[in-house]
Amino acid sequence: MIAATQLPVNGFLSTGAPFVADVNLIVQLAMGGALVAGVILARKKRYRAHGACQTTVLLLNLWMIGFEMWPSFGLQIAPHLPRVFHTAYYTIAAVHAALGTAAELLGIYIVLVAATKTKLLPPSLRFTQWKRWMRIELALWLLSLMCGIGTYYEWYVAPFR
């Protein structure tokens, strides 16, 4: 594994963003595409492939949250809450964090419910309306992705225009 001190400081998208922010943006966009591919798999009733696709995205995103997004939020946003909602720099990032947290937690819950064949959750905590919950999850994820793109823009593109 590459140590963080060995990563380039400057990004590769020519926006003024650090390298890890550029990598995160590209990975998030790819995961958004993978989520849409997962929806297509579900519509084709290829549920095993759908589950593998969506779970992989969920776990990769959990890693990206821990590696890039949570530390950035903790350093740049959390110390200034709640008194900074008058600027897009903070507001978009805070909304992104809230939507992203909701999407990630719901995704983990969906995976746990899907795994109830092994009795991870008692019947009272399971749901049966899969389409509803999957659509809510997809909507949360896509809204979070859009806010994440907005955060990237506000942090790394807009200041240099």
Could you describe each region identified by the protein language model?
Residues 1-161:
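Alpha-helical membrane insertion/targeting regions
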